[in-house]
A protein has these predicted regions:
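N-terminal organellar transit peptides
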Residues: 1-76, 82-194
Length: 194
């Protein structure tokens, strides 16, 4: 068995398919006795429920998790990044904080109770995200919420001063390491045939 950590390159949005692929890859390697993981992350964000679930899953494992921003970690991607007990970033990276939103489909009718339910859900999501990031940095939940409302972008040095990044490092993994790729490609639209 290799003594090198398992490297997982997560170059994808945080959605059902990619989070399930991440958890499956970790599960499979843990069944093989691996307990040391490096998750390389570059993500535009995505689904709050999937991001919080992935965070809780990775944090709850009897494994060593290192996360490494190799490009841009945005929105709920920051929560996934916080799953690392050791958090690294390349020098040319960024972290984007912004608030949670909800999308309504078509001409959906919303009564007062449904609007209230959606608004309460947004507030709880914001609180949960802020609590996770605050628990893993030197910032308070209010500081994080303010950063989200202000749509704050941090470079690696700023993220390090917040306690979000532990070390700025260009090297992603050792030569000869196994790399598992998780990516998402949207299917191209089919043009009508003539």
């Amino acid at each position: 068995m290799s003594t090198k950590p398992v490297v997982i390159r997560f170059f994808a949005p945080v959605i059902d398919a990619t989070v399930n692929a991440l958890m499956s890859a970790v599960d499979q390697k843990m069944k093989q006795g691996m307990k040391d993981f490096v998750i390389l992350i570059s993500s535009p964000g995505g689904s709050v429920i999937h991001g919080l679930s992935a965070y809780n899953y990775l944090k709850g494992l009897p494994a060593s998790i290192t996360t490494h921003n190799f490009g841009s970690v945005d929105s709920i991607g920051i929560v996934l990044y916080c799953a690392g007990s050791r958090r690294l970033s390349v020098p040319q990276a960024r972290f984007l904080f912004h608030g949670v939103n909800v999308q309504f489909k078509g001409e959906q009718n919303l009564d007062e109770k449904l609007l209230e339910e959606r608004l309460n859900g947004l507030r709880i999501d914001m609180e949960n995200i802020a609590k996770v990031i605050a628990a893993n940095t030197g910032k308070s939940a209010k500081d994080i919420t303010d950063a989200m409302f202000e749509r704050t972008t941090l470079n690696p040095e700023e993220a390090q001063s917040w306690g979000l990044v532990h070390e700025i490092k260009s090297e992603l993994f050792e030569a000869g390491s196994e790399v598992i790729a998780i990516q998402f490609q949207q299917q191209p639209q089919q043009l009508p045939k003539m």
